[in-house]
Design a protein with these regions (language model features):
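C-terminal alpha-helix
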Residues: 101-105, 185, 198
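A short, polar/charged loop-to-alpha-helix boundary motif
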Residues: 172-190
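FAD-site-proximal beta/loop scaffold in flavoenzymes
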Residues: 8-19, 24-100, 192-195
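A conserved beta-strand/loop element that lines the FAD pocket in flavoprotein oxidoreductases
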Residues: 1-6
Length: 218
């Protein structure tokens, strides 16, 4: 069912199906929304503020008009993985962009170093965290671990000697470590094997790097 979308949700007390814009009806017991985000930029339409999919900003979250800033889902911030500005519609990125915009508006120079896609949610008691790129091209290696007994699923995506994404289901304890590795574009070639076995921790890092991550190099 391509080239169409949901026009109406069917059912009274619970969902029984959907009506598509092309007139087709589909029966279902569950409806999951995952159709992406299109920023509402009507506020700056037909103005001097430059827009693309979202409002175009620089590393200080400034728009093309002096004195006007934008942040959050409506702005196109720098994506560390795509290496270009794009909409980063997640709460952590919105918080950081808002902070940077606020500091600069208050006269305190600040730079948005960049972000990437990151989502955390819980379905039916199962925590899920996803981050980074899925379906990337190039020298890609994916490490997957599935444990049916504990209902856990883990996938880490490597490109060369960098981690560019991961998916964790029902065991998200090490997601913070991976998020930091992606954010800082760390070369993990020296300890990639430890990361791939899914039982890693800071103890798996080389001594110098472990010291930097835990104590800031002190």
């Amino acid at each position: 069912h391509l080239g169409t979308t949901v026009a109406e949700i069917l059912g009274d007390d619970k969902v029984s199906g959907v009506l598509l814009q092309n007139g087709d009806e589909l029966s279902c017991d569950m409806l999951i929304f995952a159709i992406g985000i299109t920023p509402n930029i009507d506020l700056v339409k037909d103005t001097a503020v430059e827009t693309n999919k979202g409002i175009v900003v620089d590393k200080h979250m400034r728009t093309s008009v002096n004195g006007i800033y934008a942040a959050g889902d409506v702005a196109e911030g720098y994506d560390l993985l795509f290496k270009k500005n794009r909409v980063l519609a997640t709460l952590p990125n919105a918080y950081k962009q808002g902070e940077i915009a606020g500091l600069n508006m208050a006269g305190v120079p600040a730079v948005f170093a960049g972000g990437f896609a990151y989502n955390a949610i819980s379905f039916f008691g199962f925590p899920i965290i996803t981050a980074g790129l899925q379906g990337a091209e190039g020298n890609i290696r994916e490490e997957v671990e599935i444990d049916e007994e504990t209902c856990t699923y883990k996938k880490i995506i490597f490109k060369d000697d960098n981690i560019i994404g991961f998916i964790f289901l029902n065991d998200v304890d090490r997601a913070g470590i991976l998020t930091g590795i992606i954010r800082d574009s760390l070369d993990v070639g020296e300890f990639k094997g430890h990361l791939a076995d899914m039982k890693f921790g800071y103890a798996s890092f080389p001594k110098k790097l472990r010291k930097e991550r835990l104590f800031g190099g002190v």
